[in-house]
Every structure is written in structure tokens, then in C-alpha cells.
């Protein structure tokens, strides 16, 4: 068959052949500022809407195009006052879509070049290395960020840091402003690559490349001024900023931008927003399609309840889309839709930062046209883009139709160069302007599909992680022969998302008597390291004798060769042997579910974690399987439905995470023989590992669910216990004094761990309680090697006196995500004259219905919860820190009020007077109420664990 290169059908010249440099006409903008001004003048009342990252503010914030225009012009005028030369690079490091969007447009209007910075690493060395690299790359270092971002980079010298809050404060609306007039080939926006295989490169996109891409995307999507799109991809990603903002803006389409955490923590919200906002175009990567399907396909109570008639197309990218997943998702949508005959188009796509996001698409109705392959085809190029498959060895020899090879693309939407990196630019292109994507693909009958990657990365939920770095950490695991380990990206047949496989040679004989125990321990350690580094365990871990692990002449293991052996079945005997040994090791503790309740729970556990029911032992622990706080809610709901129970209290799931134990509790509910349990503050969230346990005291709301996601990072390292306040269960009285609470908690800690050394910490209000418990343990003659205080000062009495019932109720409501921060601050004066019932009714009406369902709240439960929080406030009103402990570790985040610097120096540094050794003060990402949320807990756990290790624990 003849080699081929695929070009789009009937490309429209005006879309990509923008060779003129004169100012734009109304019909053909040639710069991004032309796009912006035309959208504002033609569609001033169209809207940009936003939902923030805060779990405590679910409201939709909206600006019309005209209002947004005034806002960014004022910011641009204020930016001009910085006195930077035209063309200066501004590193934009912000969290929210609206802030990022405003910063980018203000930079362009002021004549600067914005560079969008993704979230920085929580590891100090990585962060400092990256920021230093960026500073050298741009030969300057102007950063526009928020208070949290400034704190993260303050240790790096030579940065010119500007706060967005200060920029907003200095901006004057209505001031005459002459916007910069760029040329089409000027640098427009810089995007940073993931840096998964080294330091990030800065991808240069000009006005011309971005406009070419956006015209082609809009034509492919069928965008018009009446379109409504929804995006939840971060603005620092090309899909979030170019594909889902600038392309729709080019056509005047209204937009809704939702922070990813609002969707990932509540996938059902994706459908609610489509219905409420009449969304026509949305984006959902494969892992979200799979998660939505798993969460919703069994929700028969929701079938026929959603009006999804508006949605015309759902784009999916970032990783290959499994055909069966796409079909199951479309079928689930069909079940949920009021119109049972509704059809849904899912468009898998291919794109990269270097191609302005998607440049190859295949929009199909997967139910009407069943896919032919395991993964959805990626289709054909957009207008102006070409693709071809070549021999990856020489990078130029075309491969015949149907034969795999290196995917290359070219066209006007492909990036111009890597900033200040001519070597990387040169190596990325071959003769004829073809860009080497690093992906392996196949083209058949004009349509492309991917079959792998040349680059050493693995994609987890759309984020690339470097394989070499992962291997470095895996090599340190006991039981692994040094330099005889390789990890490789892999997607098993039928697997929903991409994963990876670990190949290694064990240091022990697989035929020895103790091989089962050693292999089990090694594989568990490899899994734990992987989860902590990239949040994903290996799909398979394959031990191969060292004499069968061939190395190249350079002394390296070939990942490609090992993956090919796996695919060809050549490693089957090693896999079978490993499974046999692991089965022997597990057999000692495996207990088959025996009662009907145990069997039902085993099925629910298996469904949540996508495991085989036959593998579920009655001794399985929910949290050791990887259960999160969201999974707890799912277990609660499915359990209540399966057993026809009005309620399974969340705390009982936390206290009975093992199938057999939870089954006994459920049986007692079914027989209505659930006697009142004696109060025990200890909630075991994680029981594996041999290191010193950690005891974590509840915040001021009394509950401990917030610690579930943190606890899983300590699996097989150390037990993790939470302490929950008294008063949640009927018949349990509130604490009345701090001394009573501390005495109860100290006794519970001693019952759980009779002898030291101890490690205890507390979040917010719980910090002072943890401090007092540590003092009590030391008074008993025990050693406390770690006392962690998370964002709490030593002197809290004055603050406790400030909080009345209304203030406490609003604080709790904000913490639970029922009201916004602004509402919590603004409502108190008008609510205080009202009765408690009237105040609760106001909060209830403001609360998102899905959040109330998730928390299983009723007005009565909320009222009682306010009283519990109030009892803790009362205990703190007379609190005095008093004497000291041996050592303190203070963790600080952005405070509720004031600057982070003042918070540290004026409020937290006084802890030094209550520590016999110099305390440590450690900065953690996030704000007071968000530092352990979905986005921040991966970074927080690394920092927290490093302090435990620093204390010899």
C-alpha cells in the first residue's frame, strides 16, 4: 500500500492563510485583541460565568463581555505603571479561571506576553529548580500571582512579584487607555510543557497560530454567537484557554468556566450544569466519562430526570477514550435524559500544547455508529492541519495505510518555537515543517488512532508524569535488585484509562520458602510508592529473574521490549507465578464473605474500587483499598439502598471500615438491635504500617471526614487515627470544658497506643487541643516526639468570644460548603435579630441541593451540628496555653483574615514561648479551609510526612 499524509477536506484559506498584517476588519480579526474587541462590540451582553475552586462557594459568578472588558482595561492600565518594556514576559500564576483570564487579557492589552504557570510542585527542591529555570529562560522574572502563590516562591531570589489583589486595588475604571497594537506574528501567549522528562519548555504561540487554531476549531464544533460552552480544564492548559475560551470568544459564544475540583468532587454536577445553563459544547476526558458512568449508571432514581436536549457535543482528550466507556456513558446519558431517544455525540480528539490543543477530531454518535476498535478513533485533521505516519527510526519515511509509526502533524496552528531553546525547537521538526508529536499512531481509511507513545511519560487523569523519576523512587524499595527495574505506560485490553506496569528482578529466590511473604511485601511497597508519587498504583507488577532481564549495550532495560513481551504473552509464566505467590500470602488472611450482608457489602466494595467480587475478603478494609471521602458517601448511599435502611451513619462507616465489622453493624440496624455505643473519640482511618501512629484532632466543627483523604497516604507506613468530638450520637452529651475534652482524648490515645513515643496533631481549633493532649501525655511521663499545629495560634480565647450562635452557624455553613465566604461575612448582621429557625431557613435556601444530599443533611441535623460546634467554642473561651511541650511543628496557610506574613509573625510565632525547643514553621499550599481539600491534600501530605521524618518518626 502507498504511504500517505492526510490533509483536511476542502480547507478554507481565510482560516489559516493570514498572511496580511493590516488591522482586522469586522469579518477577519488577525490578532487576539481584534477578537476581544469584536466580541465586546458585537455581543456586549453575552456572558462569561465562573464557579471557583472553593468548596464553600458554589455560586456562579457572571460578567458580561462589556463588564469584563472594562475590568481588564483597568487592569491593563495599572500594569502599564510597572514600566516594563513592550514584549516583556509576565508569568501568570493564579488559581481561578476568572483571575487567569483577566490577567492574560490585561497583559495583552498592556503589550506584555503572558506565560501561564501550572501549579508548582509541593516539593521544595523541584519548585525552586523550576522557578529558577523559568527565571533564567526569560532573562527576567516578573510574576503576577496571589498571596498563596507569592508565599510559594518567596524563597527564590531575584523575582519581581506583583499581587493580583494589589493590581485590582490600583486599577481605575473608566480611565482612557490606548491598548497595545500587536502584529499577527508577535508572541501572544506562552505555555509551559509538563516538564515530565526534565525542565519545562515554553511553547511560543503567536496571534497567527492561535487564530488559525481557533477558526478551525470553531468550524469543527459548529460554534455560533448563540452557542454556550462549559469548560472545567485549568486555564493554564491550552484546552482551557484556547480551545474553550478564545475559540468560543471568536464566535461570540457565552461561556461557563468551572474549577475542576467542583466537578471531580461531585461528578453529578456536570449534568446539572448542562441542564441549568443549556450547555451545547462541553469537555470531559476519558477518566471523567468513566467516573460519571460508574456513579450514575445505577442511579435509576435519576432516570428521565435531566433535560439534556441542549448538549450537541462532548469533546474528550488528554488520553485515549475507551470505546466501551464512551458507549456506556452515552447510554447512561440516554437513561438520565427526559427524552429517552436523545442522541449524544462524543468526539475523541488529539492535540498538544504545541498544536493549540485539539487539531484532530472524530465526532460520532457512539450508539448509532458502534466504534470498530477498543479505543475511539481520533479522526481527521481540522481545516489547515495535516497528519502523517512515519518510521520512528528516521522520522521521515512514510508508513503505509494501516501500519503503525510515529505521528507527525503540520499546519498554521503548530507552535512557532520553544522560547530561548533553539536546540529543542530544531529537534522537534523534520524536513517539510512536520512536527514530531512523540506519539505512535495508525491511519486507516483516512482516520487516525493512537497505539502508544515514544516519550517516557504516563498520563494520570490527563496529567503527564515522568517515568524516569518514578523509577528512581521505585528502585529504592526493599526486594528490588538495583538497576533491574523498569516502569512503562500500559493500557490493558478493556481498561478504561491508561496506567503503567512495573517490571523488576527480585533480590530473593522466588522458589524459597519465604518468597510469598517477601513478594507480597515488595509489591505492596511498590504500590505505596506509586500512589504517593503519582496517585496511581501499577496495573501489574511482574517479577522476572535477573538472568532473564536483558539490558541494552548501554546497560539499560528496554521498556518497549518488555511491553512487547507482555503483549505477546511471553511473560505469562512470570505473571502466573507472582499471582500464585501473592495468593499464598493473602490466603493466610483471606476469609470468604459468609453472611448475606457480608456478600452484599463485598459487592458494593468491589463496585466502588472496580475489583472482582471473588477477590473480596471479609477482612478487606475500605480505606486500605483506597477509599476517599467521596467514596465514603457512595458506600453510605449504596448501603442504605441495598439494605433498605433510612440511614447508615457516616461515623459508623469510619469506625467499621472492614467488611465483616460493617456487616455486623448493618445487621444490628436491620434487626433494630443497634444499642447505643459508648462514646469513643478514636476513629481509625488507616491501620497498616509499623511506624509511630499519628493521632489527628478534629477542627472546630467536631467532625473528622476531612482527614479521610489524608489518611490514605499513610497506608503501610503508620496507623492514622482521628479524634471526633462528643455529641454527634444520641445520648452523648457535649463537652463542657477544655479539661474534660483533653482528659477524654488523652485517655483514648493511651488506650489505643499504651506507650510512646507519640505523634499528635490538630487542624485549626484541634491544634490547641492536640497541644494540650501532648502536655497531658508528657505529664504522664511519656515522650511526645511530634506535636503538629495546623494553622492555629496559641491564643484563641478572644476569637472564641467574638463568635456568637449566628457567627458559629455561618462559619460551619461555610466550612461545609453550604454558603459562600462572602455570604458568611455579610449575612450575620441582618440575621442576628431572627430566630434560630429563621436563620437556618435562610442558610438552607442558599445551600446547593447536591451538597445537602452529599452530606445527608436535614435542617434538624444542621441545627444540632451548630450546637456541637458551639459547645467547642464555649470550651475555648477560657483557654490559656500555659506550660510548654518538648517541641512543636507549626503548619501555616493563608489565614481567614489578614496577610499570611502577619499571620505567621504576629499570630503563630508566639508558639515559641510554649516549646522547649525551637519550633518549626512550615508553609503549606491553600487557604485555611482548603489546605486539606481535593486539590491540596497531595501536596500537604508530602510536607506533613517530611516533618514527621525530620522528627525521627
From Swiss-Prot:
Keyword Cell wall biogenesis/degradation: no
An example Gene Ontology biological process: biosynthetic process
Activity relative to temperature: Optimum temperature is 25 degrees Celsius.
Region (Thiolation and peptide carrier (T) domain): 597-667
Pathway involvement of the protein, from the record: Secondary metabolite biosynthesis
GO molecular function: acid-thiol ligase activity; transferase activity
Activity's dependence on pH: Optimum pH is 7.4.
E.C. number(s) listed in UniProt: 2.3.1.-
Enzyme class: transferase
Region ranges (Adenylation (A) domain): 37-460
A Pfam family reported for this protein in Swiss-Prot or TrEMBL: PP-binding
Region (Thioesterase (TE) domain): 693-795
Domain Carrier: 592-670
Keywords: Phosphopantetheine, Phosphoprotein, Transferase
Residues recorded with modification O-(pantetheine 4'-phosphoryl)serine: 629
Database matches in SMART domains: PKS_TE
Family: Belongs to the ATP-dependent AMP-binding enzyme family.
Role: An L-tyrosine:2-oxoglutarate aminotransferase (probably invD) and atromentin synthetase invA5 catalyze consecutive steps to turn over L-tyrosine into atromentin, which represents the generic precursor molecule for the entire terphenylquinone and pulvinic acid family of pigments, which are widely distributed secondary metabolites in homobasidiomycetes. The first step catalyzed by the aminotransferase converts L-tyrosine in to 4-hydroxyphenylpyruvate (4-HPP).
Protein name in the entry: Atromentin synthetase invA5
Organism lineage: Eukaryota, Fungi, Dikarya, Basidiomycota, Agaricomycotina
Amino acid at each position: 500500500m502507498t504511504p500517505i499524509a492526510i490533509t483536511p477536506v476542502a480547507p478554507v484559506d481565510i482560516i489559516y492563510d493570514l498572511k496580511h498584517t493590516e488591522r482586522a476588519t469586522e469579518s477577519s480579526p488577525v490578532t487576539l485583541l481584534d477578537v476581544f474587541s469584536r466580541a465586546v462590540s458585537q455581543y456586549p451582553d453575552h456572558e462569561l460565568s465562573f464557579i471557583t475552586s472553593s468548596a464553600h462557594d458554589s455560586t456562579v459568578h457572571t460578567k458580561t463581555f462589556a463588564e469584563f472588558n472594562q475590568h481588564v482595561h483597568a487592569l491593563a492600565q495599572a500594569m502599564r505603571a510597572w514600566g516594563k518594556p513592550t514584549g516583556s514576559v509576565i508569568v501568570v500564576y493564579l488559581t481561578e479561571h476568572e483571575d487567569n483570564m483577566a490577567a492574560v487579557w490585561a497583559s495583552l492589552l498592556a503589550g506584555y506576553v503572558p506565560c501561564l504557570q501550572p501549579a508548582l510542585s509541593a516539593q521544595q527542591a523541584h519548585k525552586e529548580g523550576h522557578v529558577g529555570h523559568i527565571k533564567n529562560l526569560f532573562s527576567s522574572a516578573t510574576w503576577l500571582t496571589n498571596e498563596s502563590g507569592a508565599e510559594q516562591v518567596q524563597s527564590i531570589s531575584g523575582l519581581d512579584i506583583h499581587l493580583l489583589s494589589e493590581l485590582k486595588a490600583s486599577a481605575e475604571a473608566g480611565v482612557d487607555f490606548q491598548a497595545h497594537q500587536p502584529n499577527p506574528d508577535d508572541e501572544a501567549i506562552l505555555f509551559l510543557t509538563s516538564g515530565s522528562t526534565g525542565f519545562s519548555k515554553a511553547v511560543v504561540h503567536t496571534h497567527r497560530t492561535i487564530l488559525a487554531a481557533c477558526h478551525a476549531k470553531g468550524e469543527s464544533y459548529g460554534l455560533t454567537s448563540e452557542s454556550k460552552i462549559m469548560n472545567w480544564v485549568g486555564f493554564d492548559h491550552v484546552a482551557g484557554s484556547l480551545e474553550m475560551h478564545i475559540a468560543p470568544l471568536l464566535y461570540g459564544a457565552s461561556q461557563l468556566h468551572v474549577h475542576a475540583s467542583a466537578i471531580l468532587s461531585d461528578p453529578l454536577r456536570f449534568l446539572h450544569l448542562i441542564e441549568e445553563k443549556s450547555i451545547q459544547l462541553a469537555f470531559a476526558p476519558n477518566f471523567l466519562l468513566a467516573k460519571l458512568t460508574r456513579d450514575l449508571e445505577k442511579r435509576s432514581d435519576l432516570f428521565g430526570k435531566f433535560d439534556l436536549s441542549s448538549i450537541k457535543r462532548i469533546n474528550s482528550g488528554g488520553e485515549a477514550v475507551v470505546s466501551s466507556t464512551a458507549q456506556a456513558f452515552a447510554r447512561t446519558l440516554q437513561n438520565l435524559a427526559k427524552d429517552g431517544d436523545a442522541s449524544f455525540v462524543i468526539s475523541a480528539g488529539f492535540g498538544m500544547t504545541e498544536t493549540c490543543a485539539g487539531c484532530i477530531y472524530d465526532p460520532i454518535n457512539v450508539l448509532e455508529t458502534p466504534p470498530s476498535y477498543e479505543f475511539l478513533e481520533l479522526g481527521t485533521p481540522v481545516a489547515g492541519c495535516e497528519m502523517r505516519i512515519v518510521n520512528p527510526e528516521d522520522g521521515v519515511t512514510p508508513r503505509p495505510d494501516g501500519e503503525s509509526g510515529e505521528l507527525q502533524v503540520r499546519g498554521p496552528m503548530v507552535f512557532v518555537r520553544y522560547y530561548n531553546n533553539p536546540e529543542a525547537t530544531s529537534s522537534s521538526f523534520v524536513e517539510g515543517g512536520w512536527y514530531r508529536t512523540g506519539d505512535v499512531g495508525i491511519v486507516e481509511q483516512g482516520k487516525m488512532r493512537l497505539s502508544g507513545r515514544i516519550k517516557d511519560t504516563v498520563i494520570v487523569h490527563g496529567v503527564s508524569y515522568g517515568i524516569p523519576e518514578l523509577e528512581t523512587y521505585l528502585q529504592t524499595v526493599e526486594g528490588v535488585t538495583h538497576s533491574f527495574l523498569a516502569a512503562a505506560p500500559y493500557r490493558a485490553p478493556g481498561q478504561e484509562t491508561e496506567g503503567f506496569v512495573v517490571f523488576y528482578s527480585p533480590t530473593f529466590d522466588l522458589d524459597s520458602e519465604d518468597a510469598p511473604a517477601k513478594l507480597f511485601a515488595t509489591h505492596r511497597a511498590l504500590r505505596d510508592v506509586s500512589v504517593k508519587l503519582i496517585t496511581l498504583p501499577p496495573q501489574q507488577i511482574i517479577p522476572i529473574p535477573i538472568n532473564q532481564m536483558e539490558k541494552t549495550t548501554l546497560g539499560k532495560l528496554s521498556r518497549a521490549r518488555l511491553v512487547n513481551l507482555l503483549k505477546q504473552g511471553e511473560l505469562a509464566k512470570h505473571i502466573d507465578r507472582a499471582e500464585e505467590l501473592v495468593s499464598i500470602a493473602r490466603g493466610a488472611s483471606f476469609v470468604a464473605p459468609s453472611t448475606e450482608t457480608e456478600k452484599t457489602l463485598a459487592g458494593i466494595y468491589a463496585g466502588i474500587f472496580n475489583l472482582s467480587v471473588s477477590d473480596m475478603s471479609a477482612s478487606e478494609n475500605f480505606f486500605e483499598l483506597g477509599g476517599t471521602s467521596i467514596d465514603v458517601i457512595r458506600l453510605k448511599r449504596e448501603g442504605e439502598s441495598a439494605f433498605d435502611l433510612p440511614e447508615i451513619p457516616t461515623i459508623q462507616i469510619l469506625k467499621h471500615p472492614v467488611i465483616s465489622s460493617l456487616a455486623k453493624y448493618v445487621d444490628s440496624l436491620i434487626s433494630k438491635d443497634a444499642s447505643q455505643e459508648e462514646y469513643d473519640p478514636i476513629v481509625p482511618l488507616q491501620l497498616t504500617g509499623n511506624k509511630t501512629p499519628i493521632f489527628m484532632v478534629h477542627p472546630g466543627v467536631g467532625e473528622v471526614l476531612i482527614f479521610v483523604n489524608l489518611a490514605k497516604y499513610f497506608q503501610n507506613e503508620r496507623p492514622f487515627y482521628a479524634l471526633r468530638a462528643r455529641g454527634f450520637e444520641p445520648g452523648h452529651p457535649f463537652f463542657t470544658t477544655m479539661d474534660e475534652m483533653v482528659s477524654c482524648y488523652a485517655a483514648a490515645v493511651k488506650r489505643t497506643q499504651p506507650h510512646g513515643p507519640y505523634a499528635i496533631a490538630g487542624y485549626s481549633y484541634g491544634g490547641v487541643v492536640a497541644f494540650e493532649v501532648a502536655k497531658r501525655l508528657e505529664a504522664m511521663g511519656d515522650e511526645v516526639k511530634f506535636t503538629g499545629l495546623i494553622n492555629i495560634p496559641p491564643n484563641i480565647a478572644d476569637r472564641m468570644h467574638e463568635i456568637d450562635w449566628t457567627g458559629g452557624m455561618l462559619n460551619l455553613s461555610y466550612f461545609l460548603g453550604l454558603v459562600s465566604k462572602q455570604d458568611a461575612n455579610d449575612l450575620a448582621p441582618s440575621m442576628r435579630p431572627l430566630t434560630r429557625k429563621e436563620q437556618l431557613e435562610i442558610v438552607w435556601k442558599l445551600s446547593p441541593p447536591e451538597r445537602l444530599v452529599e452530606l445527608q443533611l436535614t435542617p434538624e441535623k444542621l441545627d444540632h451540628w451548630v450546637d456541637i460546634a458551639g459547645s467547642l467554642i464555649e470550651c475555648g473561651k477560657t483557654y490559656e496555653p500555659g506550660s510548654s511541650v518538648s517541641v512543636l511543628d507549626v503548619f501555616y496557610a493563608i489565614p481567614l483574615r489578614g496577610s499570611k506574613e502577619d499571620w505567621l509573625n504576629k499570630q503563630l510565632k508566639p508558639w515559641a514561648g510554649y516549646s522547649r525547643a525551637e519550633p518549626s514553621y512550615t508553609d503549606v499550599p491553600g487557604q485555611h479551609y482548603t489546605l486539606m481539600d481535593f486539590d491540596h491534600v497531595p501536596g500537604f501530605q508530602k510536607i506533613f510526612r517530611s516533618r514527621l521524618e525530620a522528627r525521627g518518626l
